[in-house]
């Protein structure tokens, strides 16, 4: 009997050890030992759209596509790598650089990090979700694909964190999930996280929820958030697919698009195509070096708010070949770059747009 009990104990101990090893392997990533091989071109070959733009500390540009992987531009040539070279997924949603110079990619199926020609992958670890958001320093934040949570790298491990959900609330639509669509840090270091169904704010200690009720939406309006920006004045701009831009300033929220008469009178305030001259589907928001707020709309293109008036550049600048803007990015020289759905990158020169990639 004692031998049987001892054998069962050893088997359980072995199982626990193997589980811990598996968890550590997922948290610390999977190393692709072979060097990443890439193709090269003189011009950017992406056609599926540019969803992410990043300029690293050396001045190189990294461009993330909708479904073709990543391109690296060193000022002369474009190099490419995708799932064939070890990338977690070909849909790139965010790009960052850490303090050690490594380049991180948030993809539709996890996170990849590029380091000296090698890729290390961190698939979203659904087996070990974490509900406690313990404060750590030097965090990198990434979406978790379609999952209801967010990936956070704390400098050692990648952790999959679960959002606290609003209690007894209906998200109004079955396609509204808590998958991350945007991340922005404010001047106090708080992290604002946009999901389809709600906005979350993490202050280092607690996670605060901004749902339909807290954002004072009308009965015929629903949340379907696609972008968020914490600007230099402490205001939070929320891009909502269907009802336009919401502006959260301290404890009050207004519908910015409605205030500026940029929602069509016949709009159903959903995902349907909007009329020209409206701002109902903002997929991208950014602030330029002069404090102007820029919006990229799914159907009506580039908008600028200078604090008083709104300007729609797609109606006055014929250089913009595409209406849909996936991302707006401010580079190291304070140039504003626009990633378009047709696969090009445009720079605003102060008056009009020039295609640079």
List where the protein language model places each region.
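Carboxylate-rich, polar loop motifs that coordinate divalent cations or form catalytic acidic clusters
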Residues: 2-357
């Amino acid at each position: 009997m004692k031998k049987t009990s001892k054998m069962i104990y050893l088997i359980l101990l072995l199982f626990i050890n193997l589980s811990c090893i598996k968890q550590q392997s997922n948290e610390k990533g999977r190393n692709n030992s072979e060097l990443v091989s890439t193709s090269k071109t003189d011009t950017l070959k992406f056609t599926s759209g540019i969803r992410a733009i990043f300029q690293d500390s050396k001045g190189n540009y990294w461009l993330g596509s909708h479904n073709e992987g990543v391109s690296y531009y060193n000022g002369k040539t474009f190099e490419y790598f995708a799932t064939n070279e070890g990338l977690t997924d070909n849909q790139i949603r965010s790009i960052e650089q850490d303090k050690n110079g490594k380049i991180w990619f948030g993809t539709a199926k996890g996170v990849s990090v590029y380091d000296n020609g090698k890729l290390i992958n961190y698939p979203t670890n659904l087996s070990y979700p974490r509900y406690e958001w313990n404060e750590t320093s030097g965090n990198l934040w990434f979406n978790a694909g379609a999952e209801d949570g967010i990936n956070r790298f704390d400098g050692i491990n990648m952790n999959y964190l679960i959002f606290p959900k609003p209690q007894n609330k209906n998200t109004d639509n079955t396609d509204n999930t808590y998958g991350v669509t945007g991340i922005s840090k404010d001047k106090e270091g708080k992290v604002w996280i946009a999901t389809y169904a709600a906005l979350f704010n993490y202050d280092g200690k607690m996670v605060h929820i901004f749902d339909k009720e807290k954002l004072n939406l009308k009965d015929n309006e629903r949340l379907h958030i696609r972008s968020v920006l914490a600007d230099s004045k402490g205001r939070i701009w929320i891009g909502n697919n269907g009802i336009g831009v919401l502006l959260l300033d301290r404890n009050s929220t207004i519908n910015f698009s409605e205030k500026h008469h940029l929602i069509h009178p016949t709009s159903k305030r959903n995902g349907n195509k909007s009329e020209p001259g409206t701002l109902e589907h903002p997929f991208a928001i950014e602030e330029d070096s002069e404090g102007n707020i820029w919006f990229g709309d799914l159907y009506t293109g580039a908008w600028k708010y200078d604090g008083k008036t709104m300007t729609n550049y797609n109606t006055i600048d014929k250089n913009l070949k595409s209406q849909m803007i996936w991302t707006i990015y401010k580079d190291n020289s304070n140039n504003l770059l626009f990633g378009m759905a047709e696969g090009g990158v445009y720079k605003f020169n102060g008056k009009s747009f020039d295609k640079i990639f």
